[in-house]
Structure formats: structure tokens, C-alpha cells
From Swiss-Prot:
It comes from Thermococcus onnurineus (strain NA1). One of its GO terms (molecular function) is uracil phosphoribosyltransferase activity. 5-phospho-alpha-D-ribose 1-diphosphate binds at residues 87, 112, 140-148, 210. This is Uracil phosphoribosyltransferase. The keyword Lyase does not apply. Binds 1 Mg(2+) ion per subunit. The magnesium is bound as Mg-PRPP. Belongs to the UPRTase family. Allosterically activated by GTP.
Length: 222
């Protein structure tokens, strides 16, 4: 895990050969939807494991069949809310919840409009009550302009004040990270990699394309 010195609380996993191998497959234009979804699940699971290293633990006493001994409990793992940003984050959330299996789950449908305005439309919000003990994890694979996540954070914070707000993504652009940190300085961010820049259409370069379309197929207009 690498802390990026350009921002407070922003981390990437570019030092992990395993995560970089998964990311390489996700970037490859020849990777089909099934393998793409499986890759997102694997990333979510491994990144959740890494995030547990930042959670508070407590020592507990247990009894084995032979004697009493000390053990460890990851206390924060019992108080997690995962917010899934539809639709691309569904496989990522599936991986996260394999490790954070006590998590309550919220669903947000938010989509970004076209350049140059990139207006955000939020159609559906179902979020559980949030308490001061909770770590709120917002799953969204692509952190591009940051507009969607700013809007989601604005909405999620209406449901209660959390102990931590964490964004988990696959790729992020520096422009999006800066915008999110300016709007919500308290948020932490964990991504597989931080890419170079955005193009004129708001896509991350070198990126991996539209994560939702690659995972589930391109939608059609009727």
C-alpha cells in the first residue's frame, strides 16, 4: 500500500504485483465481460483485506479445546456500511463483502452526463442508518472527474455522521481526486492505481474504458 503524498489519506496498491496483474487483465481490451467481472470481484476482495489493516483491533480472551489464549478482533469490521454505485460497482462490492461480511449495504444509482457539463443524475438512493461507529465504504470502480462521488457523499452524509468515509476504486485520475478532496477533505481513498489524466470526454487515461459497459455490456436506447 502506497500513500500518495499529493493528498492526505489517498492510497494506491501499485506496489502489489498481484493487484497489478489483475489490473493488467482489466485494462486489456481483449478481456471479455465474464473475466472482467471476476477481476473486479478479486480486486474488491483483496483491497478489503488490505483496508482491514487500517481498522482498529482489540485483544480478546478465548478458550481453545486445550487452554485459554489471546486473540484479536477487528472491531471496526463489525461496523461497516458499503454503498454501491450502480452499475459498475456491483462486482467490486461482491468482493468487498466477502471480507467485510458483517456490512450493511446501501445502493445509489447515479450517472454522469456528457461533456462539457458532466451533470450528475441521481435516480435511486437506499442507504441504511449510519452511526458514529461506522466505516462507510463507497465502491465505484472509476474515479474520473469526481462529480459522481461528490454527489454521492453529499447524499450519504444526510443519513448520519460516520467514523470514517472511504472510497474504494480501481482507477483514479488526479483531477477527480483533487475535486473530491476539496469538497470532502475527510474522505479516504483506496485505489488499485492512479492514472495519468482525463481526456476531453472525461475518460481516464490510459484507463480501461467504461467499466459498466465492459462488465455488463453496452446499454441500448429504446
Amino acid at each position: 500500500m502506497i500513500r500518495d503524498e499529493r493528498w492526505e489519506g489517498v492510497y494506491s496498491f501499485e506496489d502489489s504485483p498481484f493487484i497489478m496483474e489483475i489490473l493488467t487483465e482489466l485494462r486489456d481490451e481483449n478481456t471479455g465481460p465474464i473475466a472482467f467481472r471476476k477481476g473486479l470481484v478479486k480486486l474488491g476482495r483483496y483491497m478489503a483485506y488490505e483496508i482491514t489493516k487500517t481498522m482498529e483491533t482489540e485483544r480478546i480472551k478465548i478458550k481453545t479445546p486445550l487452554e485459554e489464549t489471546d486473540g484479536i478482533l477487528i472491531a471496526d469490521r463489525r461496523n461497516v456500511v458499503i454503498i454501491t454505485v450502480l452499475r459498475a460497482a456491483i462486482p467490486l462490492m461482491e468482493g468487498l463483502i466477502k471480507v467485510l461480511d458483517h456490512a450493511r449495504v446501501g445502493i445509489v444509482s447515479a450517472s454522469r452526463g456528457k461533456a462539457p457539463k458532466f451533470e450528475i443524475e441521481m435516480k435511486y438512493v437506499k442507504v441504511p442508518q449510519i452511526t458514529e461507529k461506522d466505516t462507510v465504504i463507497i465502491a465505484d470502480p472509476m474515479i474520473a472527474t469526481g462529480s459522481t462521488l461528490i454527489k454521492v457523499l453529499d447524499e450519504v452524509k444526510k443519513y448520519g455522521k460516520a467514523k470514517r468515509y472511504v472510497i474504494v476504486g480501481v482507477l483514479a485520475a488526479p483531477e477527480g481526486i483533487s475535486r473530491i478532496k476539496e469538497a470532502h477533505p475527510d474522505v479516504e481513498m483506496f485505489v488499485a492505481a492512479i492514472d495519468r489524466e482525463l481526456n476531453e470526454k472525461g475518460y481516464i487515461l490510459p484507463g480501461l474504458g467504461d467499466a459498466g459497459d465492459r462488465a455488463f455490456g453496452a446499454p441500448i436506447k429504446v
